Amino acid sequence: MAISGFKGTLKLKPLKTPVFYKRDKDFRGYFSGHLQHKETKLSPAQLEAFRNAYNFFTKDRTGCIDSHGLMSTVAKLGMNLNAYDIYNELKCADRDRDGKINFSDFIDVLTDKKLFLKAVVPEKRICLDLANNPGILLFEILSKFVEISALHRKDIIELVSYFRKKFQESNSEILWSPYGRRAFKTDICSPPRSSTAAFANSARISIMKERDLYKFLEALKRCNLRTDSPYSKIPVFPLFPDVDGVVLGKPFKDTQKLEMLRKREPLSFFEDYFFNKRDWKTQAMNVKPLKSASGYSDDILAIDQLFKKKQHWTVSDAVALKQHVKRATDTYHLGIALDHRKEMLNLWKKIRGDLVGLESNNESFYNTFSTYTWSWNVCQELLSAKDLRLHDANVNKTSPSNSGLSSPSDLSESDPETGRKRKRKSSRGFRQ
């Protein structure tokens, strides 16, 4: 009886049909609230990066950004805004309502998720323009700083990584945001009107799935780029200069053996190895003197006789003649090099090169003079520093009067001013 009485008094309420739009609304509010709690705080490095970006603005005496400082910063970056737009931006960014933007207001605006989504993914019916879309000016100025590299590299990396992470965290919230309705039907053919939107598009592409990326590339291929766009032109330069245009030929025989023999050759001087010089002077010593009255060498005269004897030439004859021509050309170049070498030695004697280094207390004059004796006939210097020192040593042995340790009287004859100075110094020392 008790149980039946209990059943009679217990009445269940009828079930109600679920209202889907209310459930979606509640879920949407829960989802946005969950993301707000997920918001992370700024690290010390990120806070320092924002501080350095804040210091780039023109500020007043109190260290805050007023309307004049904001307009001056905008003008420096090449952005056009009138006083009314500046007032709206200042009013939107002034959180404590003191008429200025301090660092706390600056951080609150740039870390605000709604303003960030408004700057990155604007609403479809709102044109992405600074004049008609207040609240995104600080994002645009910050992106300009990154674009022109006004900040240090460390600060740029911190800011970009912060906003990239913020965009990835807000990617799911864009589904419920009124500014996210345009995200899935973006006009990729028209360039973005904002640098912040361009950075956001790059970040969006970096987190795309493979299927979405293929769709994006297919849509990008269907776009007709402008004819004056540099991206529509085919580059004429190699993209990989070390790889493109390199034709691998057939390797020579015994190349490794020759390389090992070359490395085993003894080196008398480091400069010979460094400049890869040839011993052209020994070759020039073997050159026969000119015996003909015409002034030409025997090799050139022999080639002239060959041309007179034969009127019809074959390929094999031309190959054989090539060696004679090369020998005659080398002989001619060596003869010119020897003549220039004599001229340079005469110039060294005239300027008394052995005394220039002593007078200036600079022994590198040998190397300097040797550099200016470069000859394209032998592709190296005609006189090395070693040759000049050997020449001075031979001259000093044969004629003591021309040595570097010559007497003050000899120096006074060759250079009167230098001799007078030395005589004055010696007389002063004698008086002391």
From Swiss-Prot:
Basic residues bias locations: 420-432
Domain EF-hand: 45-80, 81-116
Segments of this protein annotated with the region Disordered: 394-432
UniProt: Ca(2+) binding residues: D94, D96, D98, K100, D105
Residues with the Phosphotyrosine modification: Y273
GO molecular-function term, one example from the UniProt record: calcium ion binding
Biased composition (Low complexity): 399-411
SUPFAM superfamilies in UniProt: EF-hand (SSF47473)
Keyword Metal-binding on entry: yes
Protein name listed in UniProt: EF-hand calcium-binding domain-containing protein 3
Organism: Rattus norvegicus (Rat)
Keywords of this entry: Calcium, Metal-binding, Phosphoprotein, Repeat
Pfam assignment, any one: EF-hand_8
Highest taxon above the source species: Eukaryota
PROSITE patterns registered for this protein in UniProt: EF_HAND_1, EF_HAND_2
